[in-house]
Amino acid sequence: MLRGGGAHRTFVSTLLALIGNLWGLPRETALRKGPAFFDGNIWNSMKTLLIACEVLRPELEVLASDMRNPPPMNFLEQRLHDYPEKLRSAFQGLVDAFEQENDGPLAVLCGYGLCGRGLCGVHASRATLVFPKLHDCIPLLLGLDQKGANASSREGATYWISPGWLKYFLVPFHLESYRRFSVYEKKFGAAKAARMMKAENALLDNYKNACHIRWPEMGDAYVDEARKVAEATLLPYSEIWGSSAYLAELLHGGQSGERFLHLVPGQTIDMDVEGTICAVACPA
């Protein structure tokens, strides 16, 4: 699970655009205050839909299995993060269909952070959109708000590993480097495979350790595979216990105005000049 600055993101985008082919890929607005949300008994009568990145799918499905009436869940491919217009289009299409197919009060629970502003512009015509007030999904898995996530940052850069990352991330880092080269070479030829490995090495140079985010609810199911990733990438392996609290709260409606952004029709998600997640008016 990748995080970093501009140069780092360039390496990531270049690498994943190439690897995406391997697996068959094809203006400033005024701030507005968010609404009071779920007053009275409105929540009890609301129809809800969850739209989330598939990287969160293992954890969300575990939590939903313990709910009496979990919301319907739609998962979008992780690789869409590298194609923001396609991500916005896919997300918007699910919102539009949900509104067209249902009457009455509606809420869309969003299993995404700001994600590099990839979802800026998505909006609803009738539903309320509920977003975690987070820049990415790492705090969701750790159970931390953005301030807590910032305070918990480790010395040096951490390559985060989670069950969803292991299942859905495009770079086959569970394979040793010579095996990855062989996969690339068969698809693209030796010259391009060499360039892809060079991009990988530059990417991994940004990290000092690989940290597996574990949940008690998941047991030991992914430990061996996470260790293989650390070994194959030559990064020291570590573990940290995450928490299901944030994602569980999202599944139950995300009613906290401190931890969740509630967007009324005509608003979208963005961040202000200080980097705080906020609601803004959709461009006309």
Which role fits each region the language model picked out?
Residues A127-E176:
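Long, charge-dense
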Residues A194-A284:
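Extended, basic/helix-rich recognition subdomains
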Residues L94-G148:
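N-terminal glycine-rich phosphate/adenylate-binding segment common to multiple enzyme folds
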Residues P70-E85, E239-W241:
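A short beta-strand-loop structural module common to alpha/beta enzyme folds
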Residues M46-M67:
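N-terminal basic/disordered segments at the start of proteins
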Residues Q100-G116, C120, W160-S177, H262-A284:
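Extended, charge-rich low-complexity interaction segments
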Residues I51-P58, L80-H81, V108-C120, H135-D136, ...:
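Gly/Ser/Thr-rich loops at beta-strand to alpha-helix junctions
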